[in-house]
Amino acid sequence: MTEYLLSAGICMAIVSILLIGMAISNVSKGQYAKRFFFFATSCLVLTLVVVSSLSSSANASQTDNGVNRSGSEDPTVYSATSTKKLHKEPATLIKAIDGDTVKLMYKGQPMTFRLLLVDTPETKHPKKGVEKYGPEASAFTKKMVENANKIEVEFDKGQRTDKYGRGLAYIYADGKMVNEALVRQGLAKVAYVYKPNNTHEQLLRKSEAQAKKEKLNIWSEDNADSGQ
């Protein structure tokens, strides 16, 4: 719409200039010619003002929402915040080590993975030894990954490995997140939460709250004083 008005304004300016030319050629013929000259000049000035205003409006509309007509972003107007989406990657099981640790073949290389945001009772700790519900957690994870036809890993937005070189990820067995399944069964706590590696934190906390409500395994009454 602005482009059409701009074109009309330019046409008006041309007509006004022609009228002024006619008025100048007849200015000596009398009072009416002088009035005609004044009218034509006024039309030209008004037209130039309108054209200038429309031109500014057209330029502004080209950067509406921070995007030029060409489709490129104008960084002075709009700055988009990039959001990295999580995606799953295929892997192959080598073995389950304990409740929250598995060894996988990932991108052609063997790699040990530590499940993000969860902590299961120990079974192989040099000082803690075997903790209550540790064997159950290990058996649960082992069953999930060994019975799965498809294993996938999903890294979060932050660092991908810990200080021991283990991958930090959500592990999926046939589409089911092992991390969440452990928490839901009361075999793991939500732990080691560090931003930005906490995309699924609320999902896990919701599952943990339900496990507590149902007093499952580490949240059971007979385990209340065990320090779990």
From Swiss-Prot:
It catalyses: Endonucleolytic cleavage to nucleoside 3'-phosphates and 3'-phosphooligonucleotide end-products. Binds 1 Ca(2+) ion per subunit. It is found in: Secreted. Coiled coil: none annotated. Keywords: Calcium, Endonuclease, Hydrolase, Metal-binding, Nuclease, Secreted, Signal, Zymogen. Ca(2+) binds at residues 100, 119-120. Its EC number is 3.1.31.1. GO terms for cellular component: extracellular region. The keyword Metal-binding applies. Pfam families: SNase. Residues 1-23 form the signal peptide. Belongs to the thermonuclease family. This is Thermonuclease. It comes from Staphylococcus aureus (strain N315). The gene is nuc.
